[in-house]
Design a protein with these regions (language model features):
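Short, glycine-/small- and polar/acidic-enriched structural segments
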Residues: 23-150, 154-169, 173-179, 192-196, ...
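Conserved C-terminal helix/tail region of periplasmic/extracytoplasmic solute-binding proteins
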Residues: 287-314
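Secondary-structure end/capping motifs
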Residues: 217-296
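Bacterial N-terminal signal peptides
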Residues: 5-16
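Pocket-lining segment of extracytoplasmic ligand-binding domains
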Residues: 82-83, 161-251
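Sec/Tat signal peptide C-region and signal peptidase I cleavage site
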Residues: 17-21
Length: 314
């Protein structure tokens, strides 16, 4: 990607027009309800109006997203925050610049033969990655219901759509599924043990992430992206029926299920309302990463090491 001096880029954005357009590749993990504001920002032209030509790429792999941020192949990611926290505490350049999902929309879904939580002993849990997201939630769930690490298996298979496919094929026994996939699973006869939020309340599950070296050189681009994302989220709240049609298209589900998912997203306050990162959500994620030994022993929560909120402006 062409790197323009910040002062020149700011001038171009101020002047507007086609000359100001900047190419931005946005990496996301999977097709889940968290990304509806982004899809709306693209579909409604908010990204274009901010002077951005955005390409959205679905990776189904958080580690590859981080590698692409470092290499510059992707400029912005809406992805899992755990590896960003780890990278920051190791002196790396990845940073969280805004929040996305700060509460969990996942339900504990198991194959129909599993009827009780105790029957999850010996189960194969499908997760996105062994070092991200649902992995840590599975461990916290297991501990809460009395299972030890050797009592179950965690397998990295990919995002929620992939997990649903593997559940149906019998290749995994259980997984944490966000809505609307949780609705589809329950309708298909799979066991729904309820929301993971019974065991984990606030948790920064997805965030807007960048390589700080690139972001510092392209501040107007980053700020423009966040403004467009905010507009997409406002659009989702203001016109849920229309947003549900776009959600249904992108999530590859029925419009009625998409509308239900958006209603539940609002009711459960899944998304950060203003994209700001709350200490309650980030702190829970930090404590989880620390607890599984991926940070140096004795590491202390320091928001400024992980988060740069300076890009999030009105």
């Amino acid at each position: 990607m062409l790197r323009l001096k910040p002062a020149l880029l700011a001038l171009l954005f101020a002047l507007g027009g086609a000359a100001a357009a900047a190419d931005v590749r946005v990496a996301i993990v999977s097709r889940t309800v968290f990304y509806v504001p982004l899809w709306l920002a693209q579909d409604k032209g908010y990204l274009n109006e901010e002077g951005l030509r955005a390409t959205i790429e679905i990776f189904d792999n958080a580690e590859k997203i981080n590698a692409d941020l470092r290499s510059g192949r992707s400029q912005i990611a809406i992805s899992t925050p755990e590896s960003v926290v780890i990278d920051a505490y190791r002196g790396g350049s990845l940073r969280i610049i805004a929040a996305n999902a700060e509460r969990l929309p996942h339900f504990i879904i198991a194959k129909p033969q599993i009827k009780t939580l105790q029957q999850l002993r010996g189960a194969r849990f499908g997760v996105l990655s062994l070092n991200e997201g649902t992995t840590y939630l599975v461990h916290r769930l297991a501990g809460a219901i009395g299972l030890k690490p050797g009592d179950y298996e965690v397998i990295a298979v990919g995002g929620a759509p992939t997990r649903w496919k593997l559940l149906q094929e019998g290749k995994i026994d259980a997984g944490l599924q966000p809505f609307p996939l949780s609705y589809e699973a329950e309708a298909a006869g799979f066991t729904n043990f309820g929301p993971i939020s019974r065991y984990v309340s606030d948790y920064l599950f997805t965030s807007v992430n960048v390589d700080s070296k690139w972001a510092q050189e392209n501040r107007p681009v980053v700020q423009a992206f966040l403004r467009a994302l905010k507009r997409g989220q406002s659009e989702m709240a203001a016109r849920p029926g229309e947003a549900a049609l776009i959600a249904a298209r992108e999530l590859k589900t029925a419009p009625a299920l998409a509308e239900r998912a958006l209603a539940d997203t609002a009711r459960l306050k899944i998304l950060s309302p203003d994209l700001s990162v709350s200490d309650a959500a980030l702190g829970s994620t930090f404590e989880t990463v620390l607890g599984v030994g991926l940070l140096p022993p004795g590491s202390v929560y320091a928001r400024g090491r992980m988060v740069d909120s300076s890009y999030l402006v009105p």
